[in-house]
UniProtKB/Swiss-Prot annotation:
It is found in: Cytoplasm. This is 3-dehydroquinate synthase. Binds 1 divalent metal cation per subunit. Can use either Co(2+) or Zn(2+). It comes from Francisella tularensis subsp. holarctica (strain OSU18). The gene is aroB. It catalyses: 7-phospho-2-dehydro-3-deoxy-D-arabino-heptonate = 3-dehydroquinate + phosphate.
């Protein structure tokens, strides 16, 4: 069973997302028309899928691999340099090269950024192997590496040629990673009331990992993101900002833990709860709404407990570095109801007062 949908960005060529019930890498062969292929993956995914992927490629391709360490802390300049050096050392050229990102969000982000900047842009293909990367980071063209002062601070908007994935990847996905991915899925439920109702009615099948339901879940999640990206590919109008619900708080959590604590999706889960509480604090929603929204998150096995190893001062400083901020104004994605999120400006003092009473 294959599900296919199209992403139509504002400024870039359209491309397909292919969601497969089985894992069949041959589906990307039509997109590997270049003669030089560099497969970027990590040590964990390489052991599981690299051999199978390489076996699917045709014989006349010049195929090389670049295997990085696994973890958010390796989404770094050093890892980027390793990819670029591999390309240069093997004389890969702009018009004959395609990069393949075989892995989760870290691999997709860093490979996409390498593709964006190598010789001013080369083709790349996304093969996301985690639920989180399937529904979020592989779609929409955001590519980046982290800086010691903030997450995703060095990056570019750069779209792939195609996204191919399969729910068969879940067979080797740790339960913790699966639940982390569910946080991004649940985020879309707050953007779309229809999807909120669909998730609510299919919760048991999702938690049981029913294959037909999971394909539909991934497809619907990607459709929501694709619709937003089509309106505002490069965050010029503000429409795309709603995709960052939970991320302002979540990114600050990751930064404070040096990217070695909560997984990205876990941090987003906590971040959504923080954004909900902040919305209640500002009078945008009632106490009952805040409880219902947070209960919905938790019902999918997602923890919303704020880490107790983060000091408020450090957390506040991390939030001040958020990319949405401008002219020292803090910007947050806040909720007024299911399907009603908005980008709002708030003062540093307002945030400090909220943090004081919420800890």
């Amino acid at each position: 069973m294959i599900s296919k949908l199209s992403v139509n960005p504002t400024f870039s060529p359209s491309y397909n997302i292919i969601v497969d019930s089985v894992l069949d890498f041959s589906h990307i062969l039509e997109y590997v028309t270049n003669k030089q292929v560099l497969v970027v993956t990590n040590t964990t995914v390489a052991k599981l899928y690299l051999t199978k992927f390489l076996a699917a490629l045709v014989d006349d391709l010049d195929v090389r691999t670049c295997i990085l360490e696994d973890g958010e802390q390796y989404k770094s300049q050093q890892s980027l340099d390793k990819i670029l050096s591999t390309l240069l050392e093997n004389h890969f050229t702009r018009n004959s090269t395609v990069l393949v990102a075989l892995g989760g969000g870290v691999i997709g982000d860093i490979t996409g950024f390498a593709a964006a900047i190598y010789q001013r842009g080369i083709d790349f293909i996304q093969i996301p192997t985690t639920l989180l990367s399937q529904v979020d980071s592989s779609v929409g063209g955001k590519t980046a590496i982290n800086h010691q002062l903030g997450k995703n601070m060095i990056g570019a908007f750069y779209q792939p040629k195609v996204v191919y994935t399969s729910i068969e990847f879940y067979k080797t996905l740790l339960q913790r990673e699966y639940i982390a991915g569910m946080a991004e899925v649940v985020k879309y439920a707050f953007i779309s009331k229809d999807f909120y109702l669909w998730l609510d009615s299919n919760r048991d099948k999702i938690l049981a990992k029913d294959s037909v339901t999971l394909i539909e879940m991934v497809k619907r999640s990607c459709q929501i993101k694709a619709q937003v990206v089509a309106m505002d590919e490069k965050e010029l109008t503000g429409a795309r900002a709603i995709l960052n619900f939970g991320h302002t708080f979540g990114h600050a959590i990751e930064k404070c833990q040096n990217y070695r604590g909560l997984k990205h999706g876990e941090a987003v889960g906590v971040g959504m709860a923080q954004a909900i509480d902040f919305s209640h604090y500002l009078g945008l929603i009632s106490q009952q709404q805040a409880k219902d929204f947070k209960d919905f998150i938790v019902s999918f096995g997602i923890s919303i407990d704020f880490p107790n190893d983060i000091c408020q001062k450090e957390f506040l400083e991390a939030m001040l570095l958020d990319k949405k901020n401008s002219n020292k104004e803090l910007k947050f994605i806040l909720i007024e109801n299911i399907g009603s999120l908005s980008l709002q400006k708030q003062s540093k003092n307002e945030l400090e007062q909220f943090l004081d009473i919420s800890r």
